Amino acid sequence: MEQRKVHGMNRRLGLAGLLGASGLVLSGCTVAPPDNGFFHALRMGWPQGITPEAQELGNFWVWVWVAAWIIGIIMWTLMFVVIFRDSDKARKRRGDNEEFPRQTGYNVPLELGLTTLPVLIIMVLFFFNVPVQDKATALDKDPKVTVDVTGFQWNWKFGYGEINSELMPNNQNYDGVDEQAQKLAEDSQYELREGQEVGPIHGKSAEDYSYLNFNKIETVGSTEEIPILVLPSKTAIEFNLASSDVVHSFWVPEFLFKRDVFPHPEQNRSERRFQVEEINEEGAFVGRCAEMCGTYHAMMNFEVRVVSPEDFTRYIDYRQKHPEAPNSEALEAIGVDPYAVTTSPFVTDRQGTRDESSDINRNSQN
């Protein structure tokens, strides 16, 4: 009887230790993990975040893995202890000649503990998960730049909706809406015949593009050139997303965050906006479509080019003064690579392949 009491106390202490260790580890979810190889391996391929939101998401991911490993090691240890402790050989060595090991079924305290403990661990996990998620999806910043993103099969269009005066060459707030193009889009929403709305969608046209944004400064991708979205560092930015056809997804891996890009986002009950507090690293970062959207989905890439606020002002100045110039000229004017360096365009021309195949066939016949 005394031995059973000791075993019961050990179980309780073990469970309490497990809960305490898990809580202690998870309590550090917002703290950056040590910068060493072990913690880098725990990122499981996640890149280092370049926004405060991404850094918190990355920290949470790593510490959850640490907690999972601690719990896993404890559970595997307990399992192997029981396996070897209650093997026939071990029991005979102890002088236990019973047919079966001592059974612990219907042990109410143990069953309650093993039911309560996982629930508590999940509660702790959610306690730290919710603030990180809220930070990533919050729309509480004061964005200095608003970027209008339009996805289409199979490329991207980027435009600047608003830019704060701090980043403008004339020190005045910039409203980038192309009024003429916007009016044409708004006029497209209704099909009228003899003064009646005859569109197939509650009177609206199937070619309704009134929900899209059209800007004076835009960059449009093509099969020859990857679209480059130029953004300032150390600046709050808002992204306003919409698709002109099917569902896409705007994903920059270093943001550790993606958001689906819907046609008619309001009607689809989709949040079309997200914000970042700042981008704290300059450089080139690849962006991708993360939603299967058709034949060339895998080639629907873009590049985010993060420059200093001063270079961003120079870039906007060049785009305003040379509205017909390609984006590559504006990039070259501020002294950076004019074309994408993180990804390449997918050439859809098959003529070269056909010619090569013909040569191979002719050679084989000879």
What are the language-model segments listed below?
Residues E2-M75:
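Hydrophobic alpha-helical segments
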Residues I74-R85:
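Central hydrophobic cores of alpha-helical transmembrane segments in multi-pass inner-membrane proteins
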Residues T30-F60, I83-N366:
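Non-transmembrane, membrane-proximal soluble domains of secreted or membrane proteins
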